[in-house]
Amino acid sequence: MNSNANKTPIAIGISQIFPCSYLEDQQEQLLVIQEETLDPILFERLLAIGFRRSGSAIYKPRCPRCSACQPIRLPVREFIPSKRQKRTLANNRDLTWRITSSQTDEQYTLYERYIRQRHFDGPMFPPSKEQYEQFLFCHWLPPTFIEVYANNKLIAVAVTDTLPNSLSAIYSYFDPDEAHRSLGVLLILIQCRLAKLQRKEFLYLGYQIDANRKMSYKRLYRPYQILTPQGWEYS
């Protein structure tokens, strides 16, 4: 498919209305890109107007009575870690991390433990290998895995899309027994550092949802930009 978004028409569909997986009292409806294959340049343009990826599906909330999902991104060259985030980095100096494009059984085993212990009340439970692959993998954009190790033991993974001018955080998970390390925070900080090293402009974090405690943490990384009807704005 031609990556020139100004000349290539894109087929977009709209889903049925169904119960929201983030806010109990709301209903959800999605705009869905109906293209089997995109390319990184076009996908990055879709990210910039609020779309996200789940597997090979590209979607954007268009809910009938709610606008709680706010696309959020970090301009990584301006990012300044908070005191708490600096402590997280300092407290995890004994850890090592590496980047790989390989999917491993060790990664999935860690994911399964994470979902069973941390998200047993959510839509991703019970975990399965098929669900894991459908959720994270995309045939036209292989993800990058950032693996974090403690004494050669895998304890955290961030799944990330690498795009021409940005990184996009898809999902992160970690060893529940190591929760005291604030590994979710650490993984975002590592992705931000990686984006800087690769001379990217943005790290996309998905949707900020203020009314959902598990989805409201992204405002802690500053400065950040929120996509509004007027465009991306610092908040």
From Swiss-Prot:
Keywords: Acyltransferase, Cytoplasm, Transferase. Functions in the N-end rule pathway of protein degradation where it conjugates Leu from its aminoacyl-tRNA to the N-termini of proteins containing an N-terminal aspartate or glutamate. One of its GO terms (cellular component) is cytoplasm. GO terms for biological process: ubiquitin-dependent protein catabolic process via the N-end rule pathway. It is found in: Cytoplasm. The keyword Iron does not apply. One of its GO terms (molecular function) is arginyl-tRNA--protein transferase activity. This is Aspartate/glutamate leucyltransferase. Its EC number is 2.3.2.29. The keyword Cytoplasm applies. It comes from Shewanella putrefaciens (strain CN-32 / ATCC BAA-453). Pfam families: ATE_C, ATE_N. PANTHER family: ARGININE-TRNA-PROTEIN TRANSFERASE 1, ARGINYL-TRNA--PROTEIN TRANSFERASE 1. Belongs to the R-transferase family. Bpt subfamily. It catalyses: N-terminal L-glutamyl-[protein] + L-leucyl-tRNA(Leu) = N-terminal L-leucyl-L-glutamyl-[protein] + tRNA(Leu) + H(+); N-terminal L-aspartyl-[protein] + L-leucyl-tRNA(Leu) = N-terminal L-leucyl-L-aspartyl-[protein] + tRNA(Leu) + H(+).
